[in-house]
Amino acid sequence: MRIVFAGTPDFAVPSLRSVTQRADVVAVYTQPDRPAGRGRELMPSPVKLEAVARGLPVYQPQTLRSPEVLEQLRALRPDLIVVVAYGVILPEAVLTIPDDGCWNVHASLLPRWRGAAPIQRAIEAGDTETGVCLMQMEAGLDTGPVLMSLKTPINAHETSGQLHDRLAEMGAQLLSDGLGLLRAGLRPVPQPQLAVGVTYAHKLGKVESRLDWEQPAERLACRVRAFQPWPVAEVVLSGERVRIHEALALDLDHSQPPGTVLAASKEGIDVACVQGALRLCRLQREGGKAITVADYLNARRDLQVRA
């Protein structure tokens, strides 16, 4: 079975490894090298690094719409194109090239959380369950029929980074299972997505990291988890902007205005929200690194606590 693999970030690497064990990967498509780091040097994607290490041919077009790129893809004669977090839109002209079409590994239980940031949006919304889907691609955004899926609970204190790593491995396993069935002549039966329950996971933005104490504590705690490891939640704490790496929601009755520091100890800094309180457990001052609450309090002896 001849497969073209298309993917870019860390999430796609386990799936690439899985495909190489099941089929002949004739080419890997990934996004062009991007400037990164303080020196803004061009850096290859994680998928490119993995592909090069395995001796696989790598292609990095800006778009898949040009006649030259389409002809290149046709010349590869793929039986199947596998797409995992590629980040480049596949036009209909590409979808019709392989005999078995194009498969996509998506990090949610479709139709919930179609789009670019399904992991973060699931945690932000307080979802208790998510999963991965193997989808037959069509022209719409994550609208294709689902071939297979796997479910998993979202742990109470799980961050986006932690869930990302679990779902990446689950997606690789699901893809392996699907390819195994296809090779055996038992092609998974496509199931159309339900018309109800559709939600969209729009791309994360840096501006979203700023938390508002006028929100319930439970919602803010979910956002802290959702924004790890990026963009990292930010708050204003007694006049200082700090980043929050870990926090807990407290079901606490109080009569103080949102943003008021209710208590401060080595266990955490409890801040009044419009409903409940948010306990800050791990913080980062501007220009510094993430530190414990105890270390932060040693540096902020001016912190005003109002019972």
Swiss-Prot record:
<dbReference type="GO" id="GO:0005829">
    <property type="term" value="C:cytosol"/>
</dbReference>
<keyword id="KW-0648">Protein biosynthesis</keyword>
<dbReference type="InterPro" id="IPR005794">
    <property type="entry name" value="Fmt"/>
</dbReference>
<dbReference type="Pfam" id="PF00551">
    <property type="entry name" value="Formyl_trans_N"/>
</dbReference>
<dbReference type="InterPro" id="IPR002376">
    <property type="entry name" value="Formyl_transf_N"/>
</dbReference>
<feature type="binding site">
    <location>
        <begin position="108"/>
        <end position="111"/>
    </location>
    <ligand>
        <name>(6S)-5,6,7,8-tetrahydrofolate</name>
    </ligand>
</feature>
<dbReference type="InterPro" id="IPR041711">
    <property type="entry name" value="Met-tRNA-FMT_N"/>
</dbReference>
<comment type="similarity">
    <text>Belongs to the Fmt family.</text>
</comment>
<dbReference type="InterPro" id="IPR036477">
    <property type="entry name" value="Formyl_transf_N_sf"/>
</dbReference>
<dbReference type="InterPro" id="IPR011034">
    <property type="entry name" value="Formyl_transferase-like_C_sf"/>
</dbReference>
<keyword id="KW-0808">Transferase</keyword>
<comment type="function">
    <text>Attaches a formyl group to the free amino group of methionyl-tRNA(fMet). The formyl group appears to play a dual role in the initiator identity of N-formylmethionyl-tRNA by promoting its recognition by IF2 and preventing the misappropriation of this tRNA by the elongation apparatus.</text>
</comment>
<dbReference type="GO" id="GO:0004479">
    <property type="term" value="F:methionyl-tRNA formyltransferase activity"/>
</dbReference>
<dbReference type="InterPro" id="IPR037022">
    <property type="entry name" value="Formyl_trans_C_sf"/>
</dbReference>
<dbReference type="Pfam" id="PF02911">
    <property type="entry name" value="Formyl_trans_C"/>
</dbReference>
<dbReference type="InterPro" id="IPR005793">
    <property type="entry name" value="Formyl_trans_C"/>
</dbReference>
<dbReference type="InterPro" id="IPR001555">
    <property type="entry name" value="GART_AS"/>
</dbReference>
<protein>
    <recommendedName>
        <fullName>Methionyl-tRNA formyltransferase</fullName>
        <ecNumber>2.1.2.9</ecNumber>
    </recommendedName>
</protein>
<dbReference type="InterPro" id="IPR044135">
    <property type="entry name" value="Met-tRNA-FMT_C"/>
</dbReference>
